[in-house]
Every structure is written in C-alpha cells, then in structure tokens.
Amino acid sequence: MDASQQTADEVAERLFTSHQGTVEVMSVYLGDRLGWYASLASEGPATAPELAARTGTQPRYAREWLEQQAVIGLLSVQEDGAADARVYAIPPSTAEVMTDVSSLAYLAPIGRMFGAVGPALPRLLEVYRVGGGVSWDELGPDARESQADANRPWFESRLAPALSGISTLHDTLSRPAARLLDVGSGGGWSSIALARAYPGAAVVGIDIDEDSVTMATANARAAGVADRVTFLHQDASTLPAGRFDAAFAFECVHDMPRPVDVLAAVRTALAPGAPLVVMDEAVAEEFAPNGDDLERMMYGFSLFVCLPDGLSSTPSVGTGTVMRPSTLRAYGEAAGFTAFEVLPIEDFGFWRFYQLS
C-alpha cells in the first residue's frame, strides 16, 4: 500500500506490531547473552530460581523473562503452583533457533546485533546531525560475534556445494596448492569453510578489525585448519601483487569506505585472469518504495550498523547495506575489472553471489 493511502489507525497498528517485535528481539538478546536458552536446552526444564542458580543470574529477573517468553510463545510452562514453582521448558524448535549454531534456522545472533546498537544510539544521533560515523570497533563484541555466528551455518553447510556447482570456479579452487584470499574475513568461518572444501588450498584471510582477526585465528585453530588458514590484521592495499588464484569478499564490500581502492588492490593481488567472488545482500535491482521483507530488513541494518560504519572513515563513498548490483558493477569497473556476472547460486540465505574478473 502506498504510504499516502494509509489511515492513521493503520499506521498506528503497524507501529504497534513492530514495537512488539522489537521488544521480543531484545528479550532474545537477554536469553542468549545470559545463557538462559542454553541452560534450558542443555540442562532441561527449570523454575525461575533453578534457572537463576544455573546461570548466575537474579531469580526475579529470570522469572519475568520466563513469563514473557511463555506469553510470546517461545517457551512452554507447567502453570500449576506459585510463580516460582512453575516449570518452564524450551521446545525443540525454539532450542534450534536460539542455540544450535550449526542450524540454518539459528537466528539468536540477530538479537546481538541490535543489542550492540543500543549503547551506540546517542552516538548515532550525534553523527546523524554533524556527520561522521560509528565504527565496527565501537559497536563492540556483540556486533562482531553476531555477524560471525549468523553467517557461520551458511558457510559450513552451503558454501562448498554452492561453489562446486560453478564448474570453472570449482576447477580453479581445486588446483593443487591453490592460493585463496578472503577479504574482510571477520570471524573466519568463510575461510575455514573454503579450507575444508578445498583441502589442497592455502587460505589467507585479512581484516582491518584486529579483534576479528584474533577471533578468526582461534576459530581456525579449534576447527583444525590452522596449518592452512592464516589471518592477518591488514588493509588490502598492502597485499603482494599476483599472489592469489582466487579471492573472496563475503558480505563486506558494502561496509568499505573506499571499495574501489580495495577492489583495485585485490585485482592487483590476483594472478592474471583470476576471479574475485563477492557475496553481498540480495537486494532489488533498483530502489522502489514499499519494498519486500528483505529490503526492509537491509535498510534497518544500514541505518544502525553498516552505513555508520562505512562513514566512520574519511573519505567514504557511504554505500550502506543496500548495495544494488549496478553499484557493485560500477565499483568493479572503476577498479579495473572488465567482466561482471551474477553467479547462479540460489537459496543461499539473504545473499547474492557475483564474480568479477
């Protein structure tokens, strides 16, 4: 419906529904970060005092959260008895969404992303007025870990079959001693997935966020691939020329203040004719009002996370989360890439894959 055709009651009803969703996402943040979902899933049903004792939290807060979770339909409860005697359980479906880090349905990290935004709201108001931005580092571990954990199950279960379906790319990645570059590697799960999919390859992940590099290094060590995966805290502009057989940029180009400079540096770091694969949001080809659910969500991330991060460095093109295919094509051409295509990878979450060469 066109915005001008809505009544005040319709707008108010929509906002009320959105408010419910907002507070429920924030309650997920509490349950995730305080270990309440994890305890119910791993240790079984509990009363409020029992859950509080298990997790080192306060019983009265635990009770309020448990009641709220039952009211919104995420937990089940045996209603007999006094408030502190009620026993709450987490259904398997809720447990999967909130605690199973390997499931494609794992969405608890989304709550963490907006938990990170809360403390930054005064700063966001300031930069909206006077300019500048709020960097990834300023958003802290909630944002950093949210991004890594939300993407992890997709990389672990879907990346290998997706890449193997692109025959020419798969052949390149399968070469003996192939050298792969992962730009903006974050928590490292994309690099780890590449190493597992192509055991003959050596993967170098780079990121300008030092804490992400530390986290990625620990993840690679725990995954048993540290002998073939290296993470470096550096800018792409310092990469050696002609070293890599393929490069990847997973959900990071839209965050870059100077994407053309980075893409040009990556092109130089690639062997002649080697491909760069970019995974970014599968937004619409062009802007239009009354967008779909994906477009609405991505503009939300852009307002509070990605655009402020991109504008935290100067100069900046200020791309934002909603990077249209034509925008990436223009960046690639300006960086010296002469070929651009959308890869036929379907059903991969919120993302679209591009190949530049």
Which residue ranges define each predicted feature?
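Long, low-complexity, charged/polar intrinsically disordered regions in eukaryotic proteins
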Residues: M1-T17
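Conserved Class I S-adenosyl-L-methionine-dependent methyltransferase catalytic core
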Residues: R14-R33, A38-S39, Q68-A178
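Core SAM-dependent methyltransferase catalytic element
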Residues: G336-S357
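A short acidic, leucine-rich amphipathic alpha-helix
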Residues: A48-R54
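A short glycine-rich, Lys/Arg-flanked "PGG" loop and its adjoining helix->strand segment in the class I
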Residues: V260-P272
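Conserved adenosyl
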Residues: G118-D261
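C-terminal alpha-helical "lid/dimerization" subdomain adjacent to the S-adenosyl-L-methionine
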Residues: M279-A334
